[in-house]
Amino acid sequence: RLTIDKNDVHLSYLPLPHVFERCTQVSLLNAGARIGFYQGDTLKILEDLQALRPTIFPSVPRLLNRIHDRLRAQVAEAGGLKAKLFAQAYAAKQEGLKSGTFRHPLWDRLVFSKIKERVGLNRIKVMITGSAPIADHVLDFLRIVFCCPVLEGYGMTE
């Protein structure tokens, strides 16, 4: 069960007329959560994440795919022991996902906490995505690396 309170933070970067963003803001404000707005440059969203360290991150597949691709590339570039450790940690957590477990005491502390800190999602409780399809392997990657549920929303705004 997800509880939202005054300690929660949301990075708002989606257009305010967007129904998804509007519903998110109303819900969070109703619960007393805080909302930080991005700098206005979508290329600097990762900087904004690092500054605000949100607990709730509604996003769109385009950005989540970008995060996935960048992290995968960094792991491949690191190579050697780091890549092997990541692969082992990832495989262990992938097994846990089958039973609905997002966390692993050893691998989260040893591997994934560093990634979460670097991205600015070390306090994340939930990610929510919508507006377009997103691949299952990307959703699983995000659940494994960021140790949280990633929910998909569907709707029609026309």
Spans of model-derived segments:
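Conserved AMP-binding/adenylation subdomain of ANL enzymes
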Residues: R1-S12, L16-R109, V145
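Residue-level recognition of the N-termini of beta-strands and the immediately preceding loop/turn
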Residues: D8-V9, I124-V126
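Active-site phosphate/pyrophosphate- and oxyanion-stabilizing loops and adjacent acidic/basic residues
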Residues: L43, S113, D140
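Conserved A3 ("GATE") glycine/threonine-rich loop of ANL adenylate-forming enzymes
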Residues: R62, K125, G130-V138, C148-E158
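Flexible, glycine/threonine-enriched loop-and-boundary segments that flank and lead into catalytic domains
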Residues: R109, R118, D136-H137, F141-I144
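Membrane-proximal helix-turn-helix segments that form the acceptor-binding/catalytic region
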Residues: F112-I124
